[in-house]
């Protein structure tokens, strides 16, 4: 079996990049996209703003305290979706095996692509040049033998960077990788690993699978596999699923429900994008909202909404209000749909048709 070649592409500060492209006066100022009111939240920001310490999900008031000259513009999800479609169309000219994760990132499996003499590195370089030239924004790319490593690689030289992990380099690369870089390792899991003396993937390898499974259950085996740089997940163009959802974990807790309201439009837009990418036109049976509070308690509320064909923000707002009757700091927020459980055939459409 041929060694897989996976590319992960991630648009740099996507919403802000689109705003700077369309309004050149914003290119040289610290810029945030998000709610402009006193209780608004930063959805994303450009790198000039990040230099002041501004981050996604940060309350707007704190962002302006850190960066008094911060310019804030409201999000325009329709425009961002259109730009996303341009980017994804370019990716699909390289291969049909494209798995979008959100509006601004995707995996590509280029194992069997003959272009550029089969060099995934040259393919990634070509894609970055095309997106820059034709769309007017930059993307960072990571090339590796699997999805886990490709995603880490794309973040390695952000913004506007390319990083490659070849198969012979995997062992040395992961041995020094901090455990916080592993998918699914948040503050709590990292603290538990640190308590065991595990700071890097090399430490985790030395600890062994048996101890990890004893301490973390099934997650322990997955951690052990990632610590060795192993990930057999395929790039999935479409699949039949019982539900589709998107969620976002915030590096800084959302302070209240008003802040959650600010984040919801982007979540719903990403959900609809994911539904269209998966090409699933099964009847929607339920909508749900998921919240994880700062104390790590997790709550989900779902309601039957069989008349909904394309979920809208207004469909999820009552669920959020009911699930969160009073203000509490929120660590994670998600939205999703469940499909009716029947044997009706699923219509699979080509992406972006």
UniProtKB/Swiss-Prot annotation:
PROSITE patterns: UMUC. Its cofactor is Mg(2+). GO terms for cellular component: cytosol. GO terms for biological process: DNA-templated DNA replication; error-prone translesion synthesis; SOS response. Binds 2 magnesium ions per subunit. CDD domains: PolY_Pol_IV_kappa (cd03586). Gene3D superfamilies: 3.30.70.270, 3.40.1170.60, 5' to 3' exonuclease, C-terminal subdomain, DNA polymerase, Y-family, little finger domain. Keywords: Cytoplasm, DNA damage, DNA repair, DNA replication, DNA-binding, DNA-directed DNA polymerase, Magnesium, Metal-binding, Mutator protein, Nucleotidyltransferase, Transferase. Residues 6-186 form the UmuC domain. Transmembrane segments: none annotated. It is an enzyme of class 2 (transferase). Its main location: cytoplasm. Monomer. NCBIfam families: PRK02406.1. Belongs to the DNA polymerase type-Y family. This is DNA polymerase IV. The lineage of its organism: Bacteria, Pseudomonadati, Pseudomonadota, Gammaproteobacteria, Pseudomonadales.
């Amino acid at each position: 079996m041929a060694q897989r070649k996976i590319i992960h592409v991630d648009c740099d500060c996507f919403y802000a990049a689109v705003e700077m492209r369309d309004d050149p006066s914003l290119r040289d100022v610290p810029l945030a996209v998000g709610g402009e009111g006193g209780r608004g939240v930063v959805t994303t920001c450009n790198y000039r703003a990040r230099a002041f310490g501004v981050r996604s999900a940060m309350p707007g008031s704190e962002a302006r305290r850190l960066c008094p000259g911060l310019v804030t513009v409201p999000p325009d999800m329709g425009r961002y979706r259109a730009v996303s479609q341009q980017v994804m169309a370019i990716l699909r000219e390289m291969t049909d095996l494209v798995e979008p994760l959100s509006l601004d990132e995707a995996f590509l499996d280029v194992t069997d692509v003959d272009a550029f003499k089969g060099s995934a590195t040259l393919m990634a370089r070509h894609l970055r040049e095309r997106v820059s030239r034709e769309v007017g924004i930059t993307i960072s790319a990571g090339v590796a033998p699997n999805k886990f490593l490709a995603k880490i690689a794309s973040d390695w030289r952000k913004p506007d960077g390319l990083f490659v992990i070849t198969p012979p380099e995997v062992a040395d690369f992961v041995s020094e990788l901090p455990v916080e870089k592993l998918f699914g390792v948040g503050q709590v899991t990292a603290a538990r690993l640190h308590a065991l003396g595990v700071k890097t993937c090399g430490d985790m390898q030395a600890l062994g699978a048996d101890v990890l499974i004893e301490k973390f259950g099934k997650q322990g085996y997955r951690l052990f596999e990632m610590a060795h740089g192993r990930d057999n997940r395929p790039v999935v163009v479409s699949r039949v699923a019982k539900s589709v959802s998107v969620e976002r974990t915030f590096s800084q807790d959302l302070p209240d429900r008003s802040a959650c309201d600010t984040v919801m439009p982007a979540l719903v837009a990403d959900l609809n994008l994911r539904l269209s990418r998966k090409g699933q036109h099964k009847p929607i049976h339920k909508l749900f909202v998921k919240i994880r509070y700062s104390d790590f308690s997790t709550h989900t509320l779902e309601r039957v909404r069989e008349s909904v064909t394309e979920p809208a923000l207004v469909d999820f707002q009552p669920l959020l209000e009911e699930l969160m009757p009073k203000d509490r700091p929120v660590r994670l927020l998600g939205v999703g749909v469940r499909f009716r459980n029947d044997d009706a055939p699923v219509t699979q459409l080509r992406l972006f048709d």
